[in-house]
Amino acid sequence: MATFKFLVLPHQRKEDGTYNVKIRITQKGKSKYIKTSHNVSASDIIKKKDNGKEKIKIKNQAVIDLMEEMILGFKKKLTSAGVEAEHWDVDRIVEYLT
């Protein structure tokens, strides 16, 4: 079954200093990202360095709750597709969910 995670990509900072929150879907070792309508600012995130790479964690609980709710909706929709969805590739899953 596909896995879902919400995240912010450090290299995709907008000119106004905000970042778009994305949902990463992984299936059979391949990932795709779905853009959401939610953006976070510097006050909503924590930046860290991990092995020289910048990582961003969302700390705004309201955004976290919204993203978890969105992921739950995606999981429910994917489950409703039946067991055949387990054999879909990530492109087919994203197409189905969006």
Where on the chain are the PLM-derived regions?
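N-terminal helical hairpins
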Residues: 14-18, 27-98
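Short, charged/polar N-terminal "headpieces" of proteins
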Residues: 1-22
